[in-house]
């Protein structure tokens, strides 16, 4: 059975996935996979093609480079705070990442008023043009399966079944928490709409002003990839 430490870890990992989903909803709204963000999309070239094969033909985006890198880095924090690195530990860390990625992604749909569980289905999500099994895209099953394989390899490397057993119990705990979130999601949807009701937003009374050179980020046309010279910086006032 799962002990108190593992229960706490499962709750913390779920809370992390929940917050990742929540912040992405605030950033993206109903337009997932960075569809309307000022980032780049890459499907061509060796990197774009390989990524597409591994990720169900989805484009690699600048947003997702960092969105995926941050959880991987955070999960490795224990190794620089005194926990000894081992192959079994690394495999366990990667197993946790793939589970978190699935939970985080699904919660984005559960909590997002533009989708909800009812509207999360085949043909309604352009970046999930992959086979679906029941109500879920194949990517979710492959992500969970990969995490179990990694946990099994961790157990084999450690010569101890506990990494696999612990991982399986974590999956059970996360499944229960996801189910509870599905049931309670209407409360989040209500709060989401409440914060956006007419007259509630204080953007119009908040003093804002544009950046010095918004065109330097992206003007919607061909990007200027030439390096800035000293004269360019002086003319722009930077």
Predicted segments, located by residue:
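Aromatic-rich, lipid-facing transmembrane alpha helices and their immediate juxtamembrane interface loops
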Residues: 1-225
């Amino acid at each position: 059975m799962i002990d108190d430490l593992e229960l706490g870890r499962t709750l913390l990992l779920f809370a992390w996935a929940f917050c990742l989903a929540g912040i992405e909803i605030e950033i993206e709204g109903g337009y997932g996979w960075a569809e309307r963000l000022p980032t780049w999309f890459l499907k061509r070239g060796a990197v774009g093609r390989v990524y597409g094969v591994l990720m169900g033909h989805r484009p690699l985006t600048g947003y997702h480079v960092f969105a995926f890198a941050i959880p991987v880095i955070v999960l490795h924090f224990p190794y620089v705070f005194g926990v000894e690195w081992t192959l079994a530990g690394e495999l366990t860390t990667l197993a946790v990442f793939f589970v978190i990625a699935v939970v985080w992604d699904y919660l984005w749909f559960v909590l997002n008023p533009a989708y909800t569980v009812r509207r999360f289905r085949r043909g309604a999500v352009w970046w999930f043009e992959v086979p679906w099994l029941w109500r879920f895209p194949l990517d979710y099953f492959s992500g969970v399966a990969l995490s179990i394989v990694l946990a099994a390899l961790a157990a084999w490397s450690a010569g101890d079944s506990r990494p696999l057993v612990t991982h399986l119990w974590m999956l059970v705990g996360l499944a229960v928490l996801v189910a509870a979130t599905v049931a309670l999601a209407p409360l989040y949807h209500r709060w989401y709409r409440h914060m956006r009701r007419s007259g509630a937003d204080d953007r119009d009374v908040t003093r804002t002003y544009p950046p010095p050179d918004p065109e330097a980020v992206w003007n919607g046309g061909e990007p200027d990839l030439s390096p800035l010279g000293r004269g360019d910086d002086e003319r722009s006032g930077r």
